[in-house]
Amino acid sequence: KRAFIALLAIVCVYFSVQAADVNMSRYITLKVKKGTNIKLDLWADAAGTQVKIVSGSNEQTVKVDSAWTHSRNYVAEAGTMTIYGNVLRFNCCDNNANVTELNASHNAQLQGLFCSNNTITSIDVSKNPELLWLYCHENSLATLDVSHNTKLKGLRCYQNTLTSLDVSHNEQLTELDCSENKISSLDVSKNTLLTKLFCLKNAITTLDVSKNTQLTILDCGKNNLTSLDVSKNTGLEELYCFGNSIATLDFSRNASLKSVSCYNNKLTAKVLDDIYCSLPDRKGGEETGIINPVLNASSPDNSIVLATNGKNATARNWQIQYYEDDTDVTGFTGTHQCVGGTGIDETKDLPAFSIYPNPVKDILNITTDKPVHSIHIYNTYGTEVAHATDATSIDVLHLPAGVYMVHADGKVTRIIKE
């Protein structure tokens, strides 16, 4: 009898220790559909952390490491499910209609909240100042307040019903995806660290990305934009601005650009010719660039594209393709030459006129068989951006990276500014 009592005491102490290991003051609560399996994936503060999942009479304690545990199903025996313990990152994605509400206000240390593809109508993250990642896309959110989440790096809230989004307090954001909502205005001027911005399929009328100098991907397709200036986004690699009302684009300062989808806009043949001439030169082993100025061969804009001189793009190692099937556009009839819009034909291989270095960073030197009276440099739109008189060199350090035309006493050649 004494042995039994001693054993019972040991068992009680063991379970008491186990229970004490769970931090019951730190928890996340879900509103769930009773009788369903709820899929969860957990990441704890430290390896071997005890976490308790409670729903009705169903209680289960699991050991969680400081890495994803792989998703497991937990039976919802009631309309709520509470996850107790030091959970650092929480994933309840892909439960569809089985998760309708989420409350993480009692887990102030939470760094990652991943709750996409449910039917959640509201999320309060005002008590989660340590949050780094919030992925709440594919839900039913009408509002989202992230003003208290100043450490946020990644925000994905696409496919909800948001009419506005304020990210002015989230200066650490590097990725923002608010696509497929009902947003009419988006201010990203404070988000100077953004490298990826996805805001397609909204109702945005203007988009200023001049402060987002680290952008590599910009997707603003299917909005109400009439203009787009990417001159400050010198590291931009991919641009998707299709389905707007944009009338002009200039890529002369986007030396890293490799993919452009600009179909279904207000781009004329002349503007498209200028766009081709402003594309960065990807010859010399660079990956071939792709530009999609038209959706398919049946599109009303196809005749406009065929009226351009596609050779100006292919000469820079760019393929002009239909967006829908990735096939090359052929049959161009245009004759426009990339001369900066000045009406002067580009002169090549003139022995009496040479420039160096090319590409150039600062000082451009010019050698001719006669004294140079005037030097004029034009961008791809024909705007003069630099000039000098009675000189054999010109300082171009102030010019943005891109392609320019140099005119020296009637002779013309092209340079690349690094």
Please place each PLM-identified region on the residue numbering.
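Positively charged n-region of N-terminal signal peptides that target proteins for export
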Residues: K1-A3, K417-E418
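N-terminal capping/linker segments that flank leucine-rich repeat
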Residues: A3-I5, F15-G112, P129, L144, ...
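Solvent-exposed strand-loop boundary residues in beta-sheet-rich modules
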Residues: S55-E59, N96, T119, S140, ...
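Conserved hydrophobic position(s) of the canonical leucine-rich repeat
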Residues: V87, V99, L110, I120, ...
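Conserved hydrophobic beta-strand positions in leucine-rich repeat
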Residues: F90-C92, Q111-C115, L132-C136, K153-C157, ...
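Canonical leucine-rich repeat
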Residues: T100-L102, I123, L144, L165, ...
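C-terminal outer-membrane/trafficking sorting elements
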Residues: D345-E418
